[in-house]
């Protein structure tokens, strides 16, 4: 069939009439200098502070320094392919990460990209990594306990939902173990956990993930990992990415626990970026806004009031000290921002007291309102007992002739230290903690040899579970203590069958 010339011309005419010239205007700049994860870009006249920009190879950057003639950009990815003269485009977006239920059980990097080899994330929801903290009137005071499963913490420095509790100590004193145990203990507590690993070895993160998986804790945990091999900008944004993921759950009325492991490495990464961007250094070469770096992050942890759904974010930031010096710059900053600190001491750790919590320097500024009634009653005198024991212990080294009252205090102190010891990855439920602490504080362990205390505890708690489960049930349901007679009867019945070791 021949096509007529008129038809062709009519077709061309209609195509020409319908043609729309689509023109897009993009603000572009040129890289004038690049190195160490920082690019200096000329142009980008209308760029916003904190805006994402895109390099020619698809790598994103974050506009940080807005100067008269150029923009300092931190590069969020590999920077070896970026060279002088490359084009940089504005995106008009600020930094956002994917959020939602789909992230639970996954390991992601600070950009929200999965790194666990289990395929893409099926979520379309995102949140900006920087957002203002909730206001004063949107909050509510902390009144619900967050059970860590660690006796020394739940009894001496209780943590509440919505609190910020700093965990501080030298390297290799068991800080990460405290966090992992706390996450494991949230199994049936309807909590979502976010573990942010900043500047950790890949192998360490792998071990933590495998521990969580083995105990079934990955079913309610998101792991955000910015390992030591990542460029500094990713270490800097990792905590903000983690808290953005947590906020999505908090504003939907859920309770979240977020662990930052650790903020010292984030501060060091931020110092590196600031020095490369030629910002003036201050104390310990940190930039002037290193306090704001952490305060704006930790203020996003809150307990919301009921009109906003009553959700909460509880933050456990970690800070690593050098030789136990808690008066350095970053430790003092974070201590002043948080609602208390748990100080892990290397001397205690090496002497076999684990978790190595120094009860004298550790404090919770929320205190009793984050404990159930039963725990408040049994743990009331525990801190004082421990403090007086530590004081007497140093005196007792010099003199052997001690009066009976002092001897009794020392003996009780030794048993207190033994009871507060705990193996890793074995968190205890609050009913079991209350039961053993009752036996300790009421003097029922005074006739048990010190070397038998740990065995007595394990066997006694197992015996109560089998022969007197009503004790655990009453503590769980009423949050109060059962009658003294019930406890005493159970303790005495077990003591009759307990085999003390020969002294």
UniProtKB/Swiss-Prot annotation:
The keyword Nucleotide-binding applies. It comes from the Bacteria. This is ATP synthase subunit alpha. GO terms for cellular component: plasma membrane; proton-transporting ATP synthase complex. It is an enzyme of class 7 (translocase). One of its GO terms (molecular function) is ADP binding. It is found in: Cell membrane. It comes from Macrococcus caseolyticus (strain JCSC5402). InterPro entries: ATP_synth_asu-like_sf, ATP_synth_asu_C, ATP_synth_asu_C_sf, ATP_synth_F1_a_nt-bd_dom, ATP_synth_F1_asu, ATPase_a/bsu_AS, ATPase_F1/V1/A1_a/bsu_N, ATPase_F1/V1/A1_a/bsu_N_sf. Its EC number is 7.1.2.2. The record marks 362 as: Required for activity. Signal peptide: none annotated. Belongs to the ATPase alpha/beta chains family. ATP binds at residues 169-176. It catalyses: ATP + H2O + 4 H(+)(in) = ADP + phosphate + 5 H(+)(out). Produces ATP from ADP in the presence of a proton gradient across the membrane. The alpha chain is a regulatory subunit. Keywords: ATP synthesis, ATP-binding, Cell membrane, CF(1), Hydrogen ion transport, Ion transport, Membrane, Nucleotide-binding, Translocase, Transport. It is a peripheral membrane protein. F-type ATPases have 2 components, CF(1) - the catalytic core - and CF(0) - the membrane proton channel. CF(1) has five subunits: alpha(3), beta(3), gamma(1), delta(1), epsilon(1). CF(0) has three main subunits: a(1), b(2) and c(9-12). The alpha and beta chains form an alternating ring which encloses part of the gamma chain. CF(1) is attached to CF(0) by a central stalk formed by the gamma and epsilon chains, while a peripheral stalk is formed by the delta and b chains. NCBIfam families: atpA, PRK13343.1.
């Amino acid at each position: 069939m021949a096509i007529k010339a008129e038809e062709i011309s009519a077709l061309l005419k209609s195509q020409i009439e319908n043609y729309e010239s689509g023109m897009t205007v993009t603000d572009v700049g040129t890289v004038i200098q690049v190195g160490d994860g920082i690019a200096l870009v000329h142009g980008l006249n209308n760029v916003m502070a904190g805006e994402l920009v895109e390099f020619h190879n698809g790598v994103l950057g974050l506009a940080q320094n807005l100067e008269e003639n150029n923009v300092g950009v931190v590069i969020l990815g590999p920077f070896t392919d970026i060279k002088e003269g490359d084009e940089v485009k504005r995106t008009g977006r600020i930094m956002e990460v994917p959020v939602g239920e789909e992230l639970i059980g996954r390991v992601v990097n600070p950009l929200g990209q999965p790194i666990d080899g289990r395929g893409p994330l099926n979520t379309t929801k995102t949140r900006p990594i920087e957002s203002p903290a909730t206001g004063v009137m949107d909050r509510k005071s902390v009144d619900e306990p967050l059970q860590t499963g660690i006796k020394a913490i739940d009894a001496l420095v209780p943590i509440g939902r919505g609190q910020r509790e700093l965990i501080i100590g030298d390297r290799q004193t068991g800080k990460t173990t405290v966090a992992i145990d706390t996450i494991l203990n949230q199994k049936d507590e309807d909590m979502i956990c976010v573990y942010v690993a900043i500047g950790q070895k890949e192998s360490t993160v792998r071990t933590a993930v495998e521990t969580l998986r083995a105990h079934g804790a990955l079913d309610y945990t998101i792991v955000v990992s910015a390992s030591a091999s990542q460029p500094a900008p990713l270490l800097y944004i990792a905590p903000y990415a983690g808290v953005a993921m947590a906020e999505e759950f908090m504003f939907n009325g859920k309770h979240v626990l977020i662990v930052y492991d650790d903020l010292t490495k984030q501060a060091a990464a931020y110092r590196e970026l600031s020095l490369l961007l030629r910002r003036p250094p201050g104390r310990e070469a940190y930039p002037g806004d290193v306090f704001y770096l952490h305060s704006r992050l930790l203020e996003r942890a809150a307990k919301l009031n009921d009109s906003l759904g009553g959700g909460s974010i509880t933050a456990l930031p970690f800070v690593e000290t050098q030789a136990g010096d808690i008066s350095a710059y970053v430790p003092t900053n974070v201590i002043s921002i948080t609602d208390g600190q748990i100080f892990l001491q290397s001397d205690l750790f090496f002497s076999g007291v684990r978790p190595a919590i120094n009860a004298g320097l550790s404090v919770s500024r929320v205190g009793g309102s984050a404990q159930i009634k039963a725990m408040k009653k049994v743990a009331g005198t525990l801190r004082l007992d421990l403090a007086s024991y530590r004081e007497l212990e140093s005196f007792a080294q010099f003199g052997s002739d001690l009066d009976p009252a002092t001897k009794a205090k020392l003996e009780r102190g030794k048993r207190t230290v033994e009871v507060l010891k705990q193996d890793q990855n074995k968190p205890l439920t609050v009913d079991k903690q209350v039961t053993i602490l009752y036996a300790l504080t009421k003097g029922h362990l005074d006739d048990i040899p010190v070397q038998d205390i740990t065995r007595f505890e394990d066997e006694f708690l197992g015996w109560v579970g089998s022969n007197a489960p009503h004790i655990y049930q009453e503590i769980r349901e009423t949050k109060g203590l059962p009658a003294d007679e019930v406890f005493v009867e159970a303790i005495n019945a077990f003591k009759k069958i307990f085999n003390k070791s020969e002294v």
